[in-house]
Amino acid sequence: MIRGAVYRVDLGEARRGHEQRGRRYGLVVSPTDMALSVATIVPTSTQAQPAVFRPEIELGGVHTRFLVDQLRSIDVRFVHDEPAFFLHRDELEEVEVAVARYLGL
């Protein structure tokens, strides 16, 4: 897994409230150099409501919200294929600031 890369992920089909589910893009925020069995990701949505902790970044010409409020770790078996997109340094920093703000760090 590459930190700052956006992969296709499968968040499962469990219906629990407003949690994102199904197949979508997810940004890997866990460290690249740690070979773990889970990856920490920020799920994305093209339809989510705006919020200070949901930065909007264009992916492949589509305005996409990064749902920092739904940050989670998933088994690496549910991270599919090669990266679909790579965030630029300033875009990744925008997500990191949103994570810090959301977690009160």
Q: Can you describe what each PLM-predicted range is?
A:
Residues 1-105:
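Conserved functional hotspots at enzyme active or ligand-binding sites that engage polyanionic ligands
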